[in-house]
Amino acid sequence: MSNEKIRQDVLTYMESHATHPVSYDDLGRDLRYKGKGLGALWTEIELMIKDGLLVKTRFNTLGLPRAMGLVTGRLQVTQKGYGFVVPLEKTEEGDLFIPAMHLSGAMNEDLVIARVSDHGYGGRREGKVIRILERAHERFVGTFTRSGDFGFVTPDNRHIGQDIYVRRKDFLNARNGDKVVVKITVWPNGRQKAEGTITEILGKKGDVGIDIISIIKDKDCLLY
């Protein structure tokens, strides 16, 4: 049985039981999967959770995101710091507004799950990121600035919206104004800023051709 067939069976079943979360036992029994098919079912369910098509609750039950007041999608962060979750499944409600204080450490283009608030400002639908399913980037191109025994990289992509802290041992001999590639070692979480290590020095800001090199490198840093 194909993975696509299993996935469709699960989604059809969940749609018909959307009013409440479903246990693994009920799902396996009602779909009548057995033997290797049952193992394939559990494997596909874990992939669906990872993809944000299903949500696993703390009670070890499964539900559809929209039936639980959740939205799964790619986060688009604006240069002003707030963002929008663009749903994987298009709906009449459209994108979900996320205030900067409710990004919860998520960064531009990450795949996230957000909880929809009951009341948004001015009647606008808004929410809060509650889970980061997939990071879109782990490396960023930016400009290095040193400040004593630490430094930081300001990403060229202004939609990232935050500097990345770098400890002295991770400078890779970078100097003020260097264009660098920095790899995240500690992800932001809403309370703590991102930390990283410099993996490559591209050249000095303003060098001939450095802008083109930086753009190419930045595209190479995309994970998905």
Model-predicted segments: where are they?
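Charge-lined substrate channels and their catalytic hotspots, especially those that engage the 3′ end
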Residues: 1-223
